[in-house]
Amino acid sequence: MQLSIPLSILDLVSISDGSTAREGIAASMESARLADRLGYHRLWFAEHHNTPNLASSATALLISQAASVTENIRVGSGGVMLPNHAPLMVAEQYGTLANLHGDRIDLGLGRAPGTDGMTAQALSRSSAEPQAFAQHIYDLQAWFGETGTAHSTPILSSVSQGMEVPIWVLGSTVNGASIAGQLGLPFSLASHFAPDQIDDAIRVYRESFSTEAPTARIDTPQVMAGINVIVADTDAEAQRQFTTLQQMFLDLRAGRRRKIQPPVDPEQFAGSSPGMLEISAVGSPETVKAQLDEFVERTGADELITVTYAFDPAVRNRSIELLAELWF
């Protein structure tokens, strides 16, 4: 199978044990430069809060810095968790980004808080209900449009006026897929950590897709699917490096709060269920190519967005390089 669909990167700005948030951010910017040189299509930053191992909290600031050190790659949010933000502020922030960096900015929007309940309450700014979410998107599009004025209020956002920042809907379930389809917007599926509803979510998105919605901006359904990827020179080395992510998800389930851990002997995970990490491509370039081929054939995805965790930033960058070699 000829791999021809765009390939992108989702970065959560990991903080390895013994390092700092500053070092994690610096490593992410170096990876951004590399991805740009290698021809990746997008670089998106996630939004997470109250986590010791991730520094992707102020997403718009990370986007601005990454855009300033790159030239061609699209840079955006994967995504802004809208319940945490006033929609007007989102319009003003991403309008400013578009003014600073031109037509390379994407705005991915999600309904989840991206954190625990206590932190979500501290951050809460808008409703996560589907109807409110749809209205916020409608207003954001208007703030990015010719008038710069929302549909639901006469408030003007001059900094976002005319910027036409593309909006994506993020989701991990059939419900999220249905919302994206009904809104007539591209859909980014979080299959890299939520594998259970992949096939149904993609089907529902395509079946519910409508170009008649006032929010519709594309003519045909567009799916970007997430997948964990670690490429190394050998299958054995890739499996060893993958244990960093496996430990992270074990920590998540156990409620253990610590930074990203170094790899361990893969035998510690022998026979264990992949669980949330089922959608992963791990191995040598030849192995990963076959796994990606299979995933693209299964999903019919129009684009892949890859997530790579590694304790050592050099290992992550080597994976990004090897993946580019087999893809481009």
Segments the model singles out, each with a brief description of its role:
Residues M1-I73:
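N-terminal beta1-alpha1-beta2 module of alpha/beta enzyme domains
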Residues Q2-L3, D36, I63-N72, A98-I105, ...:
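Acidic (Asp/Glu)-rich catalytic clusters
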Residues S127-L156, Q197-D302:
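An alpha-helical appendage that flanks or caps ligand/catalytic pockets
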